[in-house]
Amino acid sequence: MFAYIKGVLAFFNPSQAIVDVHGVGYLLFIPCRLLGQLPQIGEPVQFYTTYVVREFSHTLYGFLSYQERDIFEILMNVTGIGPKMALSLIGHLSMSELQIAVMRQDLSTLCRVPGVGKKTAERLIVELKDKLAAIGHLDTSDHIEPLTQDPKSKSVQDAMLALINLGYNQTTAQKAIKQGMKELPEEIDLAQLITVALKHV
């Protein structure tokens, strides 16, 4: 029903965003990985969307790329995987990490995602292997990087939440964290990031 929504970012937190489109606010559920990638509040934004209708709810899910949206829709069709679990998978694993984990039958990586146990991970591998290979969005080269969760992304998310919990608004927190990241090395320590960011609020 909605292929994408384009407007002004009015609000966001680690799981939701509101996009103002000509005075109408659209609430979207988003992967937590997007927290450090969103523009500042008041700036233009575009989400590629999936509209999920359930008996008692109509929900929009938003992604910054159509590839992530397509993967989300594929994940939802796996037996026992609903929108919440699909969003969690995309929130904790990049598209390439997900593909590599499935190709290598890497249960430990899949089980790091909250809510994913061994049986669910095995089902993901069985049902996704051919589907992920067929869509062609993801990197299928033999030069595969080691599987790791992105500590930088996680630190940014946690630092954002910490500043918001200290009473700073989202715009101020985001600006401070972006400035702080410029002053720190590639390997970001959460405590360091919060300390440096606080100097810019």
Swiss-Prot record:
Record keywords, A-Z: Cytoplasm, DNA damage, DNA recombination, DNA repair, DNA-binding
Span list, region Domain III: 153-201
Molecular function in Gene Ontology: ATP binding; four-way junction DNA binding; four-way junction helicase activity
SMART domains: HhH1
Region (Domain II): 65-143
Region (Domain I): 1-64
CDD domains linked: UBA_RuvA_C
Cellular component GO terms held in the UniProt record: cytoplasm; Holliday junction helicase complex; Holliday junction resolvase complex
A matching Pfam family: RuvA_N
Region described as Flexible linker: 144-153
Gene3D superfamilies given in the database record: 5' to 3' exonuclease, C-terminal subdomain (1.10.150.20), DNA helicase RuvA subunit, C-terminal domain (1.10.8.10), Nucleic acid-binding proteins (2.40.50.140)
Keyword Transferase in record: no
Subunit architecture: Homotetramer. Forms an RuvA(8)-RuvB(12)-Holliday junction (HJ) complex. HJ DNA is sandwiched between 2 RuvA tetramers; dsDNA enters through RuvA and exits via RuvB. An RuvB hexamer assembles on each DNA strand where it exits the tetramer. Each RuvB hexamer is contacted by two RuvA subunits (via domain III) on 2 adjacent RuvB subunits; this complex drives branch migration. In the full resolvosome a probable DNA-RuvA(4)-RuvB(12)-RuvC(2) complex forms which resolves the HJ.
Family statement drawn from the similarity comment of this UniProt entry: Belongs to the RuvA family.
Function: The RuvA-RuvB-RuvC complex processes Holliday junction (HJ) DNA during genetic recombination and DNA repair, while the RuvA-RuvB complex plays an important role in the rescue of blocked DNA replication forks via replication fork reversal (RFR). RuvA specifically binds to HJ cruciform DNA, conferring on it an open structure. The RuvB hexamer acts as an ATP-dependent pump, pulling dsDNA into and through the RuvAB complex. HJ branch migration allows RuvC to scan DNA until it finds its consensus sequence, where it cleaves and resolves the cruciform DNA.
Comment text on domains: Has three domains with a flexible linker between the domains II and III and assumes an 'L' shape. Domain III is highly mobile and contacts RuvB.
Full protein name: Holliday junction branch migration complex subunit RuvA
Species of provenance: Protochlamydia amoebophila (strain UWE25)
Recorded name of the encoding gene: ruvA
